[in-house]
Amino acid sequence: MNRRKRSLWKRPLIAGIAVSAVTILVLSVVLFVWPRTDTPREVDAIVVLGGGSGPIRLTKGLKLALDDYAPTLLISTPEHSTCRYSLPRVSVICFHPSPGTTQGEARYVGKLASERHWSQIIVVSGRAQTTRARLRFDRCYHGTALFDPAGPVKIQNVVYEWGALAKALTIQRDC
C-alpha cells in the first residue's frame, strides 16, 4: 500500500515537469528563435543595436543603408570606441547608450527620433534579442519600429533573454 501511495504522486509530478519543459521549449522558440520580424521598407533611420553579434548586426545595418532604406544610420557602440563609418548618401551617427543596455539604446533613439521627427525606423537586433528590443522600443519610441534581426541564436542567448525579458516585464516597466 505504501508503495502505491508513492507512485500516485510521482505520475502527476512527472507529467507536470514534462508539460512545463515543453511549454518553456515552445515559448523559447516562439520568443527567441523565431521572433516576429518585419520586412524592411523605406524609413527615416536604421538603428543597429550593440551586443554579442555586433559585427553581424553592423553588416546588416550597413547593407540596409547602402540599399537606400534610410538616409540615417545609428550605430550603438561601446564607450570609448570611435566611429569611423562613412557612407555615400547616408548620415552615420554613432552613440554610446547610457545605460549600455537595450533599454539605454531605446531611450536614446526615442529622444533623438522625437527631436528629428522620425516616424519610422528599422531596428537591427540580435535574433534572440528581438522580442525584448521590441518591448523596449514600444515603450520609448512613439513611431513605427520595424525589426530586422541578424545573427544566429545560441543557447546562452536564450537563457540570458529569459532573464532579461522577465526583468523588463516586472522590474523595469517604463522607458
Which sequence ranges carry the predicted segments?
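Short hydrophobic helices that act as membrane-entry/anchoring signals
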Residues: 157-175
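A structural signal for short, hydrophobic/glycine-enriched beta-strand patches
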Residues: 32-163
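Short secondary-structure transition/capping segments
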Residues: 9, 120-126, 168-174
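N-terminal type II signal-anchor transmembrane helix
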Residues: 4-37
